[in-house]
Amino acid sequence: MLSATKQTFRSLQIRTMSTNTKHYDYLVIGGGSGGVASARRAASYGAKTLLVEAKALGGTCVNVGCVPKKVMWYASDLATRVSHANEYGLYQNLPLDKEHLTFNWPEFKQKRDAYVHRLNGIYQKNLEKEKVDVVFGWARFNKDGNVEVQKRDNTTEVYSANHILVATGGKAIFPENIPGFELGTDSDGFFRLEEQPKKVVVVGAGYIGIELAGVFHGLGSETHLVIRGETVLRKFDECIQNTITDHYVKEGINVHKLSKIVKVEKNVETDKLKIHMNDSKSIDDVDELIWTIGRKSHLGMGSENVGIKLNSHDQIIADEYQNTNVPNIYSLGDVVGKVELTPVAIAAGRKLSNRLFGPEKFRNDKLDYENVPSVIFSHPEAGSIGISEKEAIEKYGKENIKVYNSKFTAMYYAMLSEKSPTRYKIVCAGPNEKVVGLHIVGDSSAEILQGFGVAIKMGATKADFDNCVAIHPTSAEELVTMR
């Protein structure tokens, strides 16, 4: 039997639910990068478009992902660069070594958050410019195939559409089987931290954990990284795995290899955490624990009411054209989980709208998920496009591939006592040595990879690389001069 409170709440919902169903050409559930891009592109073709967002426009990337993460990376990178100034003959009357580093976390957080808020406003204005209707609230399919949205004022509206896109993104996974797991936070929680932790434990060997550990260490926190294997970034080529792992250890990040956390305890007197690991060791007096052990699809939009199929990982199944198994319902981005990168969601969203609402030439438009470049904003940066050396051997056979390697110290570090590694690898296949994989570690890897990504997407061979005149002196010239 319902309590009086629940009965009153249900009555309130019934009283405030709209009896009119509003119809659109296109309804987008999720105001992240992919959803916004698709909505704007559809509206640009004249489609009457509605976008529903539960939290803030921009999704994970703008609010708790790529954008504020990169801002923090800049701060951490600058802290390291400043410590190099004395060796370059600059400010020698000032103590700029790492031991004297100070960082005003609260002030910087305020500036960073203000920047994110400005971006939210820009997203809003861009949607308004394209005449996209925006509703803030929680969307859910009902059994009629329409979408009910519980708005922030607790009123509920019902919408129908010719085409519906689910682009609800993903969310962090917590290890709920570990006692005390709730004493830690996730990458979202990282951006809510009001003070810089003096001692922090980051759990996970993926790119999110590696990036956050690098930021904390660069800004002066005692940083511990707990990983299950011997290396970080195990989904990347071994040259990236080994180079970043070794450099993090060399730089002073406490990397706990072959380790798992079995229990987390809190000292109520000191407010500090004690992290127990499987090897009977522990990390004591920890200020913050950050779980970065993976992400999962953000569901809860009533997909079961319309019969949307999920895979074994509870991700929405979508084909190469972003179609789900339900006619006129589509899905893309992290909720699908093919390639969980913001530019991928944006590109897929735009191509979907091209196909649905654009001119005849776009009737078969779809995103090519092959050779998508990706980078890790570690310290130093790393980037990859194509397949790893191991994958190339499995695909083409060892006798049919050729691998070019180079490891060197960039010129910037010639004046410095502390060095940072640069490591490049080109993986080629077949008699014409088509470049099927490019893996780089070193300063400015993200900027370098963008241009080479175009070449590889176009089917470049090693000879094409060789025929490009080098720009000297740069690190990137090594990629067109390797033998």
Curated annotation (Swiss-Prot):
Please list the reactions this protein catalyses: 2 glutathione + NADP(+) = glutathione disulfide + NADPH + H(+)
Q: Tell me which GO cellular component terms the UniProt record holds.
A: cytoplasm; cytosol; mitochondrion; nucleus; peroxisome
Say if the entry is tagged with keyword Mitochondrion: yes
The top EC class, named as a word, is oxidoreductase
GO BP term, pick one: cellular response to oxidative stress
Q: Which residues are glycosylated?
A: 278
Q: What is its main location?
A: cytoplasm
**Positions carrying N-acetylmethionine:** 1
**Recorded GO MF terms:** flavin adenine dinucleotide binding; glutathione-disulfide reductase (NADPH) activity; NADP binding
Q: How is the cofactor bound?
A: Binds 1 FAD per subunit.
Locate the residues binding FAD: 33-34, 53, 60-61, 69, 139, 334, 342, 472
Phenotype reported upon loss of the gene: Impairs glutathione reductase activity.
Cite the Pfam families for this sequence.
Pyr_redox_2, Pyr_redox_dim
User: Which positions form S-S bridges?
Assistant: 61-66
Known EC number(s)?
A: 1.8.1.7
Q: Which residues form the active site?
A: 472 (proton acceptor)
Q: Where does NADP(+) bind?
A: 205, 208, 211, 228, 234, 294, 340, 375
Cofactor(s) of this protein: FAD
Q: Where in the cell is it found?
A: Cytoplasm; Nucleus; Mitochondrion; Peroxisome
What does this gene product do? Answer: Catalyzes the reduction of glutathione disulfide (GSSG) to reduced glutathione (GSH). Constitutes the major mechanism to maintain a high GSH:GSSG ratio in the cytosol.
* Complex formation: Homodimer.
Q: What else is known?
A: The active site is a redox-active disulfide bond. Present with 7600 molecules/cell in log phase SD medium.
What protein am I looking at? Glutathione reductase
Species of origin reads Saccharomyces cerevisiae (strain ATCC 204508 / S288c)
